[in-house]
């Protein structure tokens, strides 16, 4: 599942159906029925206990920013024209790595009671006028990536310090963090599973 407006380059779902199917034909028929924005690329037959959401061991997201107005990429990049210090934001990324309570970057009204996530990697890259944030973790909270990016941009614009960023994480308070960025720049890019199953 992703937040409304978020893109997915790799996404999985599971369905329980009879094995007595022509799966190639089924795949083609499903793609004919789906809207233009959605394409089923392939299928695999899995063990009965496989669950597309709960069997995943990690997920990777990217948040894409363009510092130049690009009409043809408007739905895929968030346009932010401010000067941004990538080095400072990468320094703040180091504070995310490991097992942390990410309450500060979660939706305020949520049914979730476990806010701990293990972040394996987080970094910013820049190519020409495009800036991309990549983050990989075992799980994500609703709105988490967008809130992290919004807060890191405050670091990158020298509105808050690295220590402030650490204090925000430690506060476990959403009101301490920065605003969430728009959903349109966020992409689910990879979902990892164990080989068995």
Question: Can you annotate each of these PLM segments?
Answer:
Residues 1-197:
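Structured-RNA-binding interfaces characteristic of tRNA pseudouridine synthases
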């Amino acid at each position: 599942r992703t937040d409304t407006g978020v893109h997915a380059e790799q996404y999985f779902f599971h369905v329980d159906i009879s094995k007595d199917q022509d799966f190639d034909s089924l795949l083609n028929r499903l793609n004919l029925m789906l809207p233009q924005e959605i394409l089923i690329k392939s299928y695999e037959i899995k063990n009965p206990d496989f669950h597309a959401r709960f069997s995943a061991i990690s997920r990777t997201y990217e948040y894409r920013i363009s510092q130049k107005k690009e009409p043809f990429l408007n739905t895929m990049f968030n346009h932010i024209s401010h000067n941004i210090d990538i080095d400072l934001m990468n320094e703040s990324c180091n504070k995310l790595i490991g097992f942390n309570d990410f309450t500060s970057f979660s939706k305020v009204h949520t049914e979730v009671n476990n806010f701990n996530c293990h972040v394996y990697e987080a970094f910013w890259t820049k190519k020409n006028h495009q800036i991309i944030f990549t983050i990989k973790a075992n799980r994500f909270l609703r709105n988490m990536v967008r809130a992290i990016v919004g807060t890191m941009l405050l670091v990158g614009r020298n509105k808050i310090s690295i220590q402030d960023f650490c204090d925000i994480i430690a506060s476990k308070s959403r009101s301490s963090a920065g605003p969430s960025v728009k959903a349109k720049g966020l992409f689910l890019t990879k979902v990892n599973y164990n080989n068995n199953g």
